């Protein structure tokens, strides 16, 4: 059995502390654009490697940079005058020696990466003209010999950790966390875009809970071709606010809610108007890992890892595997009857099997009437089950069924 430690979480439950702050950067935020591209490139490379070689080869595509363009948004429709520049970098296996034939097999890494990036942009940013508004530059290089060796060792057996690092997770989400997450999902949903097409994808939701009152401060880009006047713009905000308030009722659990959208607006002279739906068109730059953590949120009142999850290889990169695994374990432990709140930390040692962390730390707050001693064996069983089936985590990632930002 792995080194699994269970102890009491010595803190007030998150929903009972007097103040809580939670943030989510939406899919059109420049940092989230980079996260989304990095992960899409990694998933595409995984599929290409499996198709051509039967296995996922070494790669890390977590170095995506976005340099903002320049635009002239106008009521009724403006234009881009300088495109957004996106740099794909990182490392990937581009050549493989076929031991049977002695020949070098060249793999279409850069082509796969560029196509994946463009496909993601097409899906994420509905109003962007990919032929004119964005330049995608691929500079992915061959992987480090040492890291490839660690990655390839005993490929048919358990992968070995590429680094000494850690992952963290928590569950269940607090009321504030749920509302922040679901608000961004709502505003960027297909259904809402069909009803209010002027709502762009660059959305940031900042949630503040003070006692039983939650305030959402939302930055929401508007798409200029759907907004013909300042009155139209104000109407878009009013419609979006009403949708947010209605949706939040499902999660409020007795809390009061205040929704504020684009608080910097002067509704005559200064409004959040864009051509493409993202502030990346106006010099707002982005990078992988500067935004949401693996659970899709930024939670300063919870433990967090500073490691970027998107774009890292899903086989043995601890910054990816353990952050995602921590959240999965936390979610399952939180389902155990009697567990009110759970935090997970998993630490690796470089070169050791990913199924054998140096420590897997579980902290729990029991519900009233339950003791830690009776919950501990159940929590350990959940954690061990996931360590024994860690390949399932990899499969979820490769299939694109895991959120990394």
From Swiss-Prot:
Listed EC numbers: 2.5.1.6
GO-annotated biological processes: one-carbon metabolic process; S-adenosylmethionine biosynthetic process
Listed pathway(s): Amino-acid biosynthesis; S-adenosyl-L-methionine biosynthesis; S-adenosyl-L-methionine from L-methionine: step 1/1
Reactions performed catalytically: L-methionine + ATP + H2O = S-adenosyl-L-methionine + phosphate + diphosphate
Keywords from the UniProt entry: ATP-binding, Magnesium, Nucleotide-binding, One-carbon metabolism, Transferase
InterPro entries associated with the record: AdoMet_synthase_2_family, AdoMet_synthase_3, S-AdoMet_synthetase_arc
GO MF annotation list: ATP binding; magnesium ion binding; methionine adenosyltransferase activity
Cofactor(s) needed by this chain: Mg(2+)
Binding site for ATP: 141-146
Role noted for this protein: Catalyzes the formation of S-adenosylmethionine from methionine and ATP.
Family label: Belongs to the AdoMet synthase 2 family.
UniProt-recorded name of the protein: S-adenosylmethionine synthase
Lineage: Archaea, Methanobacteriati, Methanobacteriota, Methanomada group, Methanococci
UniProt gene name: mat
């Amino acid at each position: 059995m792995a080194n699994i430690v269970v102890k009491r979480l010595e803190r007030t439950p998150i929903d009972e502390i007097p103040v809580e702050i939670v943030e989510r950067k939406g899919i059109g935020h420049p940092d989230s654009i980079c996260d989304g591209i990095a992960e899409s490139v990694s998933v595409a490379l995984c599929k290409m490697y499996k198709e051509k070689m039967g296995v996922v080869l070494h790669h890390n595509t977590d170095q995506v940079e976005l340099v903002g363009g320049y635009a002239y948004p106008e009521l009724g429709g403006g234009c881009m005058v300088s495109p957004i520049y996106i740099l794909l970098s990182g490392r990937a296996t581009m050549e493989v020696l076929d031991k049977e034939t002695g020949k070098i097999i060249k793999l279409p890494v850069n082509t796969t990466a560029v196509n994946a990036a463009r496909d993601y942009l097409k899906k994420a940013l509905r109003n962007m003209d990919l032929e004119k508004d964005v330049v995608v530059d691929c500079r992915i290089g061959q992987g480090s010999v040492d890291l490839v060796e660690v990655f390839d060792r005993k490929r048919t057996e358990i992968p070995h950790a590429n680094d000494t690092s850690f992952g963290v997770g928590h569950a269940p989400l607090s009321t504030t966390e749920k509302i922040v997450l679901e608000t961004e999902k709502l505003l960027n949903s297909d259904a809402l875009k069909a009803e209010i097409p002027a709502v762009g994808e660059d959305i940031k939701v900042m949630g503040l809970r003070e006692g039983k009152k939650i305030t959402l401060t939302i930055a929401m880009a508007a798409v200029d071709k759907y907004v013909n006047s300042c009155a139209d713009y104000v109407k878009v905000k009013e419609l979006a606010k009403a949708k947010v308030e209605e949706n939040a009722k499902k999660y409020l659990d007795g809390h009061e809610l205040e929704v504020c959208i684009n608080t910097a607006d002067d509704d005559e002279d200064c409004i959040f108007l864009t051509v493409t739906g993202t502030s990346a068109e106006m010099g707002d730059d982005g990078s992988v890992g500067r935004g949401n953590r693996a659970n899709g949120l930024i939670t300063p009142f919870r433990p967090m890892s500073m490691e970027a999850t998107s774009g890292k290889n899903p086989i043995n990169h601890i910054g990816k595997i353990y952050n995602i695994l921590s959240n999965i374990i936390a979610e399952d432990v939180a389902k155990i009857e009697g567990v009110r709140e759970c935090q997970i930390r998993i630490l690796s040692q470089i070169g050791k099997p990913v199924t054998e962390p140096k420590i897997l730390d579980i902290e729990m707050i029991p519900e009233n009437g339950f003791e830690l001693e009776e919950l501990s064996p159940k929590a350990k069983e959940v954690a061990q089950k996931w360590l024994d089936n860690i390949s399932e985590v990899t499969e979820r990632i490769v299939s694109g069924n895991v959120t990394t930002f």
